[in-house]
């Protein structure tokens, strides 16, 4: 999982399932870069889910930035709604991906037991 990553230099050949969580108004690691990454990698590599939180800035899940502030020239600000929704998104993403792994393991174990 990647909270507000820098997608500008990211490879389009991701090898593991990934969820990207980013704020629409992030001026440090812009969501537009992640949207371009998704366009570049369409159909390549492991599945990637991009979630953009409307009105949210960089560090939207860091409660210490409740009032917002400038950090290294960028605006960081907590957004309780985006933070809560991101936890649910990560939970659902991990549950889905781990269920896929569990299914593959069950299939492998069953085939091993038949040999």
Outline where the language-model segments fall.
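Alpha/beta-hydrolase-fold catalytic nucleophile elbow
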Residues: 1-4, 21, 53-54
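Secondary-structure boundary/capping motif
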Residues: 10, 29-30
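Short helix-capping segments at alpha-helix termini
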Residues: 42-46
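Primarily recognizes the serine-hydrolase "nucleophile elbow" in alpha/beta-hydrolase
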Residues: 1-16
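Short beta-strand/loop motif that positions the catalytic acidic residue
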Residues: 14, 20-22, 26
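Short alpha-helix in the alpha/beta-hydrolase fold that links the catalytic acid
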Residues: 16, 30-41, 65
